[in-house]
Structure formats: C-alpha cells, structure tokens
Amino acid sequence: MTTLFISDLHLDPSRPEIIATFRRFIADEAVNADALYILGDLFEAWIGDDAYDATGKQFIDAMRPLRDAGKPCFYMHGNRDFLLGERFAREAGMTLLPDPSIINLYGTPTLLMHGDTLCTDDEAYQAFRTQVRAAEWQRQFLSQGIEKRQAFATQARNQSQRHTRDSSNAAIMDVNQQAVETAMKSAKVRRLIHGHTHRPATHSFDLNNAPATRIVLGDWYEQESIKRIP
C-alpha cells in the first residue's frame, strides 16, 4: 500500500521536460499506487478553465493511464493555480480537495495543505492572497477577456519572481513555526504534509509534549520530487 504526494510542478510551455517527467511518473508508478495527491502549484499560472493552453491538454493526456486504472487523484489549489475549477479537474480525472484537509492515511490522521497560509511572516503576500481568494474578485477576474487575464498573470508572476530573488525575503518566505503548530493543534493531528516553499525536508518537533512531523514536498525543476507513504 502506497500513497503518493507531489506539489509544485509549475507546468509551463517553457518547461516541456517537466511534463515529460510527469508523464513517465504517472505511467510507471502512480498507476500502481493507492492514490495520488497533488498539493498545489501544478501549473505555473492558471487564468481559468476556459483558457488552458497546450500544457493543460498535455496534462490531461498524461493522466489517462491513471484514469484508465481507476486510481483516485486529489488536487489542492496552490498560489499559482487557485482558479483551476471543477471543469478542468473533471477532464483530468482529479477531485478538488479543500485547503486545508485532514485525511486518514493508513490509520494516521494527516493534515494536508499547500503551505502558503503558513508563511505568515510574509505580510505582503498574505494581503495579496486574501484579495485574490475573495469570491467577488475571482468573479470579476474571470469575466475579463483572456488577454487581459494573461497580462495580469504575467505581471503577478514577474513580481513574485522578484520577491523570491530578493535574499532579504528568504526567511519570511518559509513557514512560521507557530503557524504550523496552530494549524496542527486545530486539526488535532501530529503529521502535516505541504508544499509551496520548495524546501523538501522532514521536520520533527514537540507538539503538546508529544512527537510531531512536518513533511515538506519539493519542486520538480531539476528532478521529480515524490513523497511515498508508507
């Protein structure tokens, strides 16, 4: 029994090697797993289900072996692809999963998150996130033409890349430990799995006088990054 967790593929036409790696992963490994969880930032940008490009089509095609095998795939929104909707998820064979979600993973309650809400020290990002996750903002954005939406996405991505390259922001772009502990206490769990930070690791710490674990998923820029449980 194995369940697979991935995140932060950032699929984009400029990185065809990542979709090729993902295609092999689905055909060679995911079809034999109990389930696949994708915890956000599957795509570099997503401006609506009515506007996906060749990469979106390639992803749907890459997922075909998983659909044919009848294996479940669960998808959680990231900060880059939070507008991915039911229509595309259905075509790809994915079930949308709220952020956060608690699952029973082989007898262990496990909290799943994308991870961006844990980066509470990055106040500028959290303010932006609150704005773009509002239902009214999304309604207005999706009502705009594709070119206008694409221009906004490009601008937001460029700004995010500048923010990431600024070394003075390195600390605030990681999770806040207090936010981690608050989320885990609220969920009544001792294991958390998330992505977003691109800092793959397994962190062990004390939570209410008992051991707890935070598993961080990596990105796929250089190679595939997969967490296999158990």
Model-predicted segments: where are they?
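Short, low-complexity, intrinsically disordered N-terminal peptides in bacterial proteins
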Residues: 1-2, 230
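Tryptophan-centered motif/residue detector
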Residues: 46, 137, 217-220
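Residue-level marker for buried hydrophobic side chains located in beta-strands
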Residues: 3-5, 36-38, 111, 193
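Conserved beta-sheet core of the metallophosphoesterase superfamily
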Residues: 91-98, 109-111, 116, 121-128, ...
